[in-house]
């Protein structure tokens, strides 16, 4: 091959394959250019596809019509894993149709940490079925089937080929109307209508095909490690009025080691599942009589929640926020004005028809009107701002509420406390001038990080969502200036910043605070959202120093997301063992024998006098049984007392890790516990940590 048509590195200073840029001459496949440059095709960093200058992923078989620059996408990158997982979903579907003839295909996208595929099948899948399917998948992968892209000549040609696949036919008919961010876009997004054929490398015969946009890995041998994780019921396109399907979930990684790490994390996550811990620790429940996604907090859970809210309330008052309260329901006119009925009606509960009047004969004399349970608090906060004239001297005005909202989440996505239908937001709306914006955003972000650290989270990064040029309101210049300010504030925080291009809502850019928990999972915690839309819709104004009327800038800020969700996150983060300041039961006295109960009751009385949650276990259980019970109950301080303790006016500490400190004088024990709780120490006390305080 001549030098003119050879591939070239564009960036030769890189040290990881994830950042390698290379030039591909016209008429040459990306994979061929990659081989010329000796980029890896095996191992964790094997190149599985490439990204063009517009951010579009391309198969390695793609041949550019003109010389073009691409970025190599290795298996161990997020994009690389997503492509491997989507290809593994195809292998899953091929295996299911081989093992269960007559199965109809839904969709099979890559998702976070894995993939799924939906099937219309006669009977629900069993655990044994998953083993059989997994075995068939391994055989398919071993053959090294090639993924080959094929463009349909027409919609009619695609429909003819897929005549026996009703769900695929529906997608074909909907092409052009599919939300580009939906799972369905995996199959029929923008551009040509295409299929991917799984081709036997020995016979060159097509073994199986699927409607798909791609891209895909070159062959099934690029799937080194996968596992099917579970199956569940699902609805076609997530709509409960549509056909019921069976969904199989799986995960795939660039190496067996990474798969093992993930499965270990999953096992640990299962132990920490807040739904299970909520039952075991008697914290909350979801009674069928009340309905899906509507939690009930029991006394233990209510104590934790109260402590969470009270600490947050104190911090907000110190930071200059004004507390407000708003009702749970409102006339539909308010949400018409705010735009929520136009944009979010599907996510709202159905309206309540109220205020109609009737005469004695039952004839309606006055029509009723629609009321809605509120999905958001911001429209009501705007009414508070607009309830009287505002001066620039009042700004920034920070309104805060623990406001309960209701959102009609589909039953398939409701998940314990972390995805509920009724929940309470720690919701703030800040009204400020443009000159105050940067200082206020800096203050808000610092406050968020500081408060989250108070609860024991300490590993954060930020995500900046910027304007979608096809979907926004407001002036371009304001968007650009505000985005620059957000970026500067985020950068100055010292936290890692991840871009989310075109990810902003239509009304303004935002920063999201992402936090990692004790086992390395990432949770989106807080959002700081600018809004150029609602101040216009509500015609909000303040009087400026020159007497003119000006629009304030509005900042939406939910720190926890919701109390319920944050409760679930903390419950899993601490595996149920809440820090002593949050724990529903902080101290329990355990007598060696019944005779020592009065001694422990005196100790408990001293602790209660200081406002701590303490009690003596006076049950008939033996001491060792009591220790096991309260260890399982995650009580941070267990105080034991026997004859020597009574004689010395002392107690012995027992901790959740099994360590013990004996013979601590009662007054000293009370001070140690008091210091530990009042300082809001987020670690569990132990022999070592208590010794350090003495």
From Swiss-Prot:
Residues 273-579 are annotated as: Catalytic. Keywords: Aminoacyl-tRNA synthetase, ATP-binding, Cytoplasm, Ligase, Metal-binding, Nucleotide-binding, Protein biosynthesis, RNA-binding, tRNA-binding, Zinc. One of its GO terms (cellular component) is cytoplasm. Gene3D superfamilies: 3.30.54.20, Anticodon-binding domain, Bira Bifunctional Protein, Domain 2, Threonyl-trna Synthetase, Chain A, domain 2. SMART domains: tRNA_SAD (SM00863). It is found in: Cytoplasm. InterPro entries: aa-tRNA-synt_IIb, aa-tRNA-synth_II, aa-tRNA-synth_II/BPL/LPL, Anticodon-bd, Anticodon-bd_dom_sf, TGS, Thr-tRNA-ligase_IIa, Thr/Ala-tRNA-synth_IIc_edit. Its EC number is 6.1.1.3. Zn(2+) binds at residues 378, 429, 556. GO terms for molecular function: ATP binding; metal ion binding; threonine-tRNA ligase activity; tRNA binding. Its main location: cytoplasm. Residues 8-74 form the TGS domain. Its cofactor is Zn(2+). Binds 1 zinc ion per subunit. It comes from the Bacteria. Transmembrane segments: none annotated. It is an enzyme of class 6 (ligase). It catalyses: tRNA(Thr) + L-threonine + ATP = L-threonyl-tRNA(Thr) + AMP + diphosphate + H(+). One of its GO terms (biological process) is threonyl-tRNA aminoacylation. Homodimer. Catalyzes the attachment of threonine to tRNA(Thr) in a two-step reaction: L-threonine is first activated by ATP to form Thr-AMP and then transferred to the acceptor end of tRNA(Thr). Also edits incorrectly charged L-seryl-tRNA(Thr). Belongs to the class-II aminoacyl-tRNA synthetase family. This is Threonine--tRNA ligase. It comes from Corynebacterium efficiens (strain DSM 44549 / YS-314 / AJ 12310 / JCM 11189 / NBRC 100395).
